[in-house]
Structures are given as structure tokens and as C-alpha cells.
Amino acid sequence: VTDLKATRFELDGAVATIWLHRPHRHNAWTGRMHTELRWILAELEADPAVRVVVVTGTPPAFSVGGDSQALAGHVERGSYDTGVPVDARTPGYGLDARLDAELSALWGLRFPVIAAVNGACAGVALALACFCDLRFAAAGAKLTTAAPKLGLPAEYGLSWILPRLVGPTHAADLLLSGRVVTAAEAPYGLFNAVLPDPEALIAHVQDYARALASTVGPAAVAATKRQLVADLLRHDPAASVRESLRRMDAAMGTAEYAEGVAALRERRPPRF
């Protein structure tokens, strides 16, 4: 990717913000957008200065999901094509083979990814938000799984992730009906917080992201994210305890831990 046409991104210190950026189509999802998103994430993953990534949409939408022109093309072909080239970047791949597929690979990234759902969010865009580590939304943002009203099954792992966020009963409602709900009406567990409007949302998310980037150790965040993912994929509490003890033992020999303890004892903010 040498010329971003469907996305854009900016760096502000240790926080990167990515916009899904096709405002003339309400940021409708295309293979080009997906490819660009993967390229940006791969570039950010390679930059050790980046500690937090925010994903949002160019107003007024987050993303209305699959572009209708692309959907019509699937009808003509009679099959599905993601539109992503086979040699596209694969950020987040390699941590665990069970994550190495499109959006679930977000969990393999070293930094937290925060979804700021500022407006309409449908289909694959909802899946993108769900696979982010944290999710915040504007109260009036409209959400839908969309697929059943197109005659399609659940897409991009929504049948796996939604029950884990909101429970099987609420997930079944959203996945089977495809009905539209606002973020304010969404089942508990989908969002970390719902803000009154898009402006308040972006301000809140940027404050949260800056705090996350500056007040906690980046190695600790990366390790904790890996613990969360590992424990979600297994049913073995004893293994989780053993893994946490191993990670704590390793962390206590690092400069990051020494700084954290020094800051605590000196009653000052840590300088990570």
C-alpha cells in the first residue's frame, strides 16, 4: 500500500488514531479498506513508540458495513471474495494460530486497540469493533449485525465473539433478527462506556488512550493482553495461575517493574 484511499491515520505521541475513511459512502467496507487497515496496523506494530491504537470512522458514520456495490458483485459471482490480496500484511498473526484469521488477529497485536463507534456500525464493522480490546460509543450510534436481512449467516466471527461479550441470549437476538439498536440500547457488555454524542465520545477515548499510553507499563500491557486472550481460549484456571506466576517472575527483573515500584514509593507518576 503506497497511497491510502479508504483509511487515514495520525500519530499523537504514543497514541495512533485510524479512521475508516470513505465518507461519501458512510465509510462502507471494501477490500481496499481492509487491506489498508492491515497495512497501517502492521506499520504501527513495527513502531515501538506506539502504545495504543484508536479506530473510528470519519463522521458521521463508523462504517455501514459492506459496500452495496461489492455485495452486488458477490451476487454476480455466486461466491464471496474479501477483496484482500493474498500478499496483504498480516499484523497480529503468529501469536496463536487460533487467532490467525482476519479480524481475530487484532488480539495478537502487542498494543490495545480501542474502537470509538461514533455513528452507524453494521455487519463487518460491528465485528471489527467487537474484536477490539475496548469499545466506546456515542449513544445515538445505530448498530446491526445486518447479515440475516441480506440472506447471510453471521460474518467475520460474530457468532463467536458476540456471545462472549453480551451472553448467548442477547447475541442470538442480534444475530438472528438483524434488528437495529442504538448504542444506548445495546446489551450490557458490548461497550465499556456510552457517551452522549460523538464529540464527547472522541474526547473521552482520547483521554483514555493517552492515560493508557502514559500511566501503565507497555510491556505489562502487552503481557496482560496476551493473558486475556490465552485464558479466553482455554478452560484451565490452574494453567492461568501458573502462567501469571511465570510472567510476574519474568517482569520483576525488568527496568519497567523497577520504575513502577520506585514511582509508588516516591509517590509520583511512573515514567514508562
Cite the ranges covered by each PLM segment:
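C-terminal long alpha-helix characteristic of the crotonase
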Residues: 23, 136-141, 191-242, 255, ...
